[in-house]
Amino acid sequence: NVTGGGLLKETSDNYYTAGTAEEFLNAIQSVKKSGKASVIELTADIALGDKEVNNFDSYSSFITAHKLEPLTHPTLLKTGVSMLKLADMSNLTIYSKNGAKITHTCVDITGSNNIIIRNIEFDEIWEWDDYTEGAYDRNDWDYMTIEKGSSDIWVDHCTFYKAYDGVIDVKTPVNDSNITISWCEFLPASEDNVFFDEMMNAMKANPDNYPYYKHLLEEGMTDQQIYNYAYGQKKTHLLGQSDDDSSAKN
């Protein structure tokens, strides 16, 4: 039953609260070790970039630096972007009562079942694409990827801002995957536009450092037109292995 994952009382030994990145990762580590139905309540915003988490390498069995490092965003160049792997896990709820935020990570749910992710905001895995001139084909940063036999996954009442690639990708799903995405918001740019504006302002101040941005200006676009062009999300969901793979299901 997709709604049954990790429903525990707050007094349970397997109910964890996390207000920092380290507390959250320690909770994941404990859940993986115990193998028991568990809840992780996120009580504050956490940032999971590989350059900003204390003792990051000590969690390397399930979170690593993303293989494609940031190239242009001033914040991400400092924080890095990570890949959080929820692999071979079951009966786990990750939620927040207050809509806490997770930034600078891509969540990969692999070979897992009965997972609930609820009332969490995901933000800040986008940067301007000079490398492929706006095609956004390099970084492969998605907020969430569900793949390799994962089933009974419920993503509910979450908020997702602009991502470099996709927002939620479900790769090679089968008819009985039971993957539900409900009552979620998919929004442009970033919360209050702060993270998004930082990137746009950096380009405006130093156009020579961003060849594709400079090219658009030289072709007659205004700063505001480029801002509007970059503001929206390229794509949201993908059901299948890739856009053109024969296994893609529309």
Regions found by a protein language model. Give the residues of each.
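Right-handed parallel beta-helix
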Residues: 90-91, 95-98, 113-126, 150-164, ...
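Extracellular beta-strand-rich solenoid/capping regions of secreted or surface-exposed proteins
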Residues: 29-36, 49-93, 101-119, 124-150, ...
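Acidic Gly/Asp/Thr-rich repetitive segments characteristic of extracellular carbohydrate-active
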Residues: 1-41
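Short beta->alpha connector loops
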Residues: 21-23, 98-102
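Short, solvent-exposed beta-strand edge segments and adjacent coil->beta transition regions
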Residues: 13, 139-141, 165
